[in-house]
Amino acid sequence: MIDDDGYRPNVGIVICNRQGQVMWARRYGQHSWQFPQGGINPGESPEQAMYRELFEEVGLRKKDVRVLASTRNWLRYKLPKRLVRWDTKPVCIGQKQKWFLLQLMCNESDINMQSSGTPEFDGWRWVSYWYPVRQVVSFKRDVYRRVMKEFISPVILLQESVAARVATPPSPRRKRG
């Protein structure tokens, strides 16, 4: 499904842990790393596509995550000319993406890169929040920067709430007498 401007509707997924680190996934058989992402099927909402892609690419279900935020607007990037398939109609010149920030609520061991018949990724790791902006392929860098700027506040709030829970000692128990 390509829009009138030549962009394929797509969702991007940033998964964070309670420490504010983000999941960084290695593309299958490549030395290229990125966030999970994928196309939106006809009749599917961005949120439905996000949950489908979440399972297909990393084996997680709705119960395994909590949605912290989504981008206000669609974000676009153009593909380099060498990656455009000029022989397909309509021609796709890039992606327009709706991004979601998710908090991992399950155990890391529940992550399964092999959940679909054709895996997108063959490995993953936790990285610092801003690391992906510097490391992603150059034509996606501006979108990643915008996504991470938009999502920083919910991540800071998450880190602060975790720190507050750790720093707050339990209330003393009263003696019954």
UniProtKB/Swiss-Prot annotation:
GO terms, molecular function: mRNA 5'-diphosphatase activity
Motif placement: Nudix box: 38-59
One Pfam family linked to the record: NUDIX
Cited InterPro entries: Nudix_hydrolase (IPR020476), NUDIX_hydrolase-like_dom_sf (IPR015797), NUDIX_hydrolase_CS (IPR020084), NUDIX_hydrolase_dom (IPR000086), RppH (IPR022927)
Cofactor: a divalent metal cation
Family matches, as CDD domains: NUDIX_Ap4A_hydrolase_plant_like
EC number: 3.6.1.-
Keywords: Hydrolase
Enzyme class (EC, first level): hydrolase
GO cellular component terms attached to this protein's record: cytoplasm
Nudix hydrolase domain segment(s): 6-149
Gene Ontology biological process terms from the UniProt entry: mRNA catabolic process
Stretches assigned to coiled coil: none
Transmembrane feature ranges: none
SUPFAM superfamilies for this protein: Nudix
Record's function text: Accelerates the degradation of transcripts by removing pyrophosphate from the 5'-end of triphosphorylated RNA, leading to a more labile monophosphorylated state that can stimulate subsequent ribonuclease cleavage.
HAMAP family (UniProt xref): Nudix_RppH
Family: Belongs to the Nudix hydrolase family. RppH subfamily.
Protein's name in the database: RNA pyrophosphohydrolase
